[in-house]
Amino acid sequence: MATNFLTKLFGSRNDRLLKQYRKTVVRINAMEPDYEKLSDEALRAKTQEFKERVAKGESLDDLLPEAFAVVREGSKRVMKMRHFDVQLLGGMALHYGKIAEMRTGEGKTLTATLPVYLNALSGNGVHVVTVNDYLANRDATWMAKLYNFLGLSVGINLPNMPREEKQAAYNSDITYGTNNEYGFDYLRDNMVYESGDRVQRVLNYAIVDEVDSILIDEARTPLIISGQAEDHTAMYVAMNKIVPNLVRQEGEADPRTGEGVTKPGDFTVDEKSHQVFLTDQGYEAAERLLGHAGMIAEGASLYDPANITLVHHLYAALRANNLYHRDQHYVVQNGEIVIVDEFTGRLMAGRRWSDGLHQAVEAKEGVTIQAENQTMASITFQNYFRLYGKLAGMTGTADTEAYEFQEIYGLETMVIPPNRPSKRDDQLDRVYKTTREKYEAAIRDIRECYERGQPVLVGTTSIENSEIIDELLNKENLPHQVLNAKQHEREADIVAQAGRPGMITIATNMAGRGTDIVLGGNIEKQVAAVEADESLSEAERQQRIEQMRADWKIEHDKVSALGGLRIIATERHESRRIDNQLRGRSGRQGDPGSSRFYLSLDDALMRIFAGDRVRAIMDRLKMPDGEAIEAGIVTRSIEGAQRKVEARNFDIRKQLLEYDDVSNDQRKVIYQQRNEILDASDLYEMITVMRDDVVSDLVRQYVPAESMEEQWDLAGLEKALESEWRIQLPLQSQVQSAHAITDEEILEKVLQAAREVFDAKVELIGRENFTQFQRAVLLQSFDTNWRDHLSALDYLRQGIHLRGYAQKQPKQEYKREAFELFRQLIDQVKTEVTRVLMTVQVQSREQVEQATEALEQRSAHSLEHMTYGAPSDGDIGGSVEDEPLELPEGARVGRNDPCPCGSGKKYKQCHGKLS
């Protein structure tokens, strides 16, 4: 209460910032008459003037009013659009590294031109980040007219572009691209063998469009570049034949009484955590089935150490068959499994689930099973975007996630007021007992809208649900358009005309982003088609355009009079923000509109989180079938359930980041070292330091520091030098012939001998040629060991939560052990590189060149396969894929015995619970 009182008294921080920014808006507006008088050439010359002032030390903040005024004037001349004052406010928020929340239809794309232009003046490049290639291409092509007019270059960064084109795109003043492609380019740049092969410049400033989608929805999805690992294709096929013979248990047993199971079965499905667990009965059934299939020996246990990989494949098959559904979580396209993004409904071509899940789904659908992959490089979007010197974002829905943006990224969210107040009527949810009743009510609403000519956008959470609505509308003979991941290519065309009178458009979440739904239809697309028609004379073209605009005005006014665009949603999403995005399609720029959610107690969110409470209310009210409950208390109850899910997902993302920060720090060290190796013209000193460290470590194993001669093992040292580096050094005879010799002198003799062997190779081949070979060896060693290190960190993370049972802090233990693994990695690189360079037999420059080329080709081959990782289904550190427990050979642990790890849990609930 005290906080609310103070906010009313002094205004919120958002209000105070807006008040401060409005003073700058007044200054920009005052400049407008002067800039209107400038010729096109004089206006363009301002860009060069600004660049020179920045080069002399003037700050971008000082230039802001003038730069914004120039962009506004340029837009008026080229785009025929003038930035509203609220767009200037949004541009300032973006320049100052904030997230600007601007409602749908407020012109975020045009708003971004202001800070993009200003920050491009520094010459360090600006990256505009979009959610898909279509938007990157559209926005770059659209806005390039303005930027080029003002003297700035624009590049588009798309997948599969040749390296030279990517370099040109990144060297432009402004680069448009997707979050995935920027991240992949960063990883690829840190895997190249020639410095000239890198494409990115310094990561200076990025504006992330639809920032909530990229930095929150995708935060748990790492970008992964991977190479093929061992093939287990036959195993996935075999497991897919076994799983259908297992029966799902209905009901959940109470841990105290054992009651609650309505139908016993072999496995349970936990929809909240998105996991599957074998029951005791299922464990025995699986053993029996695997025994019949000859996959485990007679009398052997499924949880014997030798069968741990079987358990992994069994659980992958169970999850594929019971948690992942066709046309909801994935589609089958051209004989491949393509993941459907749960937040946008878009197809994620090239992305694969990890941990064998994707292969299990491929086996289930009977398509070609592709080999599993080993991670070669990875980074989360959270850590990639934190590499930028300055980061900003814009979206229509950020306020509900403002705390997370501040906590994780240090980004403040600023709500920009609309140019015109919204007239949308967001009606209370209607909740029905069954799915059938819900759909019947939604169809009635759609029919009523259609009969009066009001356009309708029907929102669904999955392709499956959109196809159900599609069938129902076909039965009712109601003409409509379907927009889901299967019609991705037609997205813009369908959405552009969704505001025409009588239009019915069914859409998954993907329709929420990027394209405005204009009442009366998108006239600009139609005008563009006429302007491109070369068969028309100029007079005919103008006449036709004028007629089209007049017709559009009639349709626009008609739709407005009918209440604008009607949003009908058939399910609540887990996130309030996604629901708000759907609502936000209606009521743009002060247009009228309305929205209504039709729900049932069978919906996933209701069933898992809020169904019992609402069902109890319905039973108390003795509501007949077909009647809906429509009350604020129900809507608030549903939003409360959504808040719980959002809080849980935030905790998962935050925990992921805390663990990933450890590997992120190590990644920075490795990539910095890699870049130094690539950029160095001579590596002799670096190799010398490495070699001396390795030689010293070896010598000290046989001749400890400050030790007596009696403690030395010179015979062992001679043998080690011969076997490790082919150095023949008669240390024993030298010591015997000397009157007195110290351990330091022994060390110096060995170092000198190693130096002479190495220098002889360098002299034979030539320093420059040998530098190339050294570079290839160093990079190959770093890459191989980094790849193995990433796998080791994954295994460590999966089992680290067990330390909690020993009263240890898992995160601290993870940091400590990860550091030790990293130290071992560095030592291993030094040892490997020294061994290769000391033992390689070279007789000519040609041999060195061939060896260098072979190393580089091996690296290039490993880059051929690239894929996405998928988000973890369990909490980080609490994943059900625990670190396998090593048991003595032949040892067997009963399912209900205490786990040998010492956790105090039963084996089936601890290391026996593998997926």
From Swiss-Prot:
Residues bound to Zn(2+): C899, C901, C910, H911
NCBIfam families, per the entry: PRK12904.1, secA
A biological-process GO annotation: protein targeting
Cell compartments where the protein resides: Cell inner membrane; Cytoplasm
Subunit relationships: Monomer and homodimer. Part of the essential Sec protein translocation apparatus which comprises SecA, SecYEG and auxiliary proteins SecDF-YajC and YidC.
Region described as Disordered: spans on this chain: 866-915
Organism of provenance: Delftia acidovorans (strain DSM 14801 / SPH-1)
Primary location class: membrane
Cofactor(s) this protein requires: Zn(2+)
GO function terms (MF aspect): ATP binding; metal ion binding; protein-exporting ATPase activity
Gene symbol of the encoding locus: secA
Enzyme Commission no: 7.4.2.8
Details of cofactor binding: May bind 1 zinc ion per subunit.
Reactions it catalyzes: ATP + H2O + cellular proteinSide 1 = ADP + phosphate + cellular proteinSide 2
Binding site for ATP: Q87, G105, E106, G107, K108, T109, D516
Pfam families: P-loop_SecA, SEC-C, SecA_DEAD, SecA_PP_bind, SecA_SW
InterPro entries: Helicase_ATP-bd (IPR014001), Helicase_C-like (IPR001650), P-loop_NTPase (IPR027417), SEC_C_motif (IPR004027), SecA (IPR000185), SecA_CS (IPR020937), SecA_DEAD (IPR011115), SecA_motor_DEAD (IPR014018)
Topological type in the membrane: Peripheral membrane protein
Family note: Belongs to the SecA family.
Ranges of biased composition (kind: Basic residues): 905-915
Protein name: Protein translocase subunit SecA
Keyword Manganese attributed: no
GO cellular component, one term: plasma membrane
Function: Part of the Sec protein translocase complex. Interacts with the SecYEG preprotein conducting channel. Has a central role in coupling the hydrolysis of ATP to the transfer of proteins into and across the cell membrane, serving both as a receptor for the preprotein-SecB complex and as an ATP-driven molecular motor driving the stepwise translocation of polypeptide chains across the membrane.
Keyword terms, alphabetized: ATP-binding, Cell inner membrane, Cell membrane, Cytoplasm, Membrane, Metal-binding, Nucleotide-binding, Protein transport, Translocase, Translocation, Transport, Zinc
